[in-house]
Amino acid sequence: MEIELKNVNYFRDGKYILKNVYFKFEKNGIYTVVGPSGAGKSTMLKLINRLIEPTEGAIFINGVEYKNIDVILLRRKIGMVFQRPFLFEGTVKENIELGPSLRGEKNIDALFYLEAVGLSKDYLFKDVNNLSGGEAQRVSIARALANSPEVLLLDEPTSSLDPTSTSIIEELIKRLNREGIMVILVTHNMEQAKRIGDYTLFLYKGELIEARKTWEFFENPVSEVSKLFLEGKLKEMIK
């Protein structure tokens, strides 16, 4: 799948959250989106998933402006997992089956998707309120996978997890990508971006400053703003 942001602006509360962003996600891989808080990273994901609409500019999916694509179909093909796992009251099985069942599908193999994220059949009938943070996040990913997405948008999925759970989620992300799912991951963790990113986008004050292969961005940043950010000195510049 190709996702193209063409001169996208998003204006809210009297200011631009994203400014004139142009980028095409066209190669299967793991794209990490980094930048300081308030740079527009999460907004970019919400725009791609059509939770919000661009103020100006347009977004294209495989060459078709996404306003011309049924929003339900769009969200089946582009799954999104949030920073805090959002699960509905009920069992793990009911959560995984939710999307397909709303479309009238029957005989959904919830166990298949549960095992795809490394959880056993013992979890199927667990109440979601009894899951750990890492388990809940994996169930969120399993629910997204049940829609057979081509792209996964992940908004800081490990920010509140312990190192062991973080490692499990990172390995899962890499495996899903190897299986053909494009991943766009927002993270504040630069080490995580280095570990799993193929490409890195750096946003600052709503502008896309750099978009390069991850190793190139970290080893040889082009922009002075990028250098300050990687050196942890960007706060001084903001002041």
Curated annotation (Swiss-Prot):
This is Phosphate import ATP-binding protein PstB 1. It is found in: Cell membrane. Keywords: ATP-binding, Cell membrane, Membrane, Nucleotide-binding, Phosphate transport, Translocase, Transport. SUPFAM superfamilies: P-loop containing nucleoside triphosphate hydrolases. The complex is composed of two ATP-binding proteins (PstB), two transmembrane proteins (PstC and PstA) and a solute-binding protein (PstS). Residues 3-230 form the ABC transporter domain. Its main location: membrane. Its EC number is 7.3.2.1. It comes from the Bacteria. The gene is pstB1. CDD domains: ABC_PstB_phosphate_transporter. GO terms for cellular component: plasma membrane. One of its GO terms (molecular function) is ATP binding. It is a peripheral membrane protein. Belongs to the ABC transporter superfamily. Phosphate importer (TC 3.A.1.7) family. Part of the ABC transporter complex PstSACB involved in phosphate import. Responsible for energy coupling to the transport system. InterPro entries: AAA+_ATPase (IPR003593), ABC_transporter-like_ATP-bd (IPR003439), ABC_transporter-like_CS (IPR017871), P-loop_NTPase (IPR027417), PstB-like (IPR005670). It catalyses: phosphate(out) + ATP + H2O = ADP + 2 phosphate(in) + H(+). PROSITE patterns: ABC_TRANSPORTER_1 (PS00211), ABC_TRANSPORTER_2 (PS50893), PSTB (PS51238). SMART domains: AAA (SM00382). GO terms for biological process: phosphate ion transmembrane transport. Pfam families: ABC_tran. ATP binds at residues 35-42.
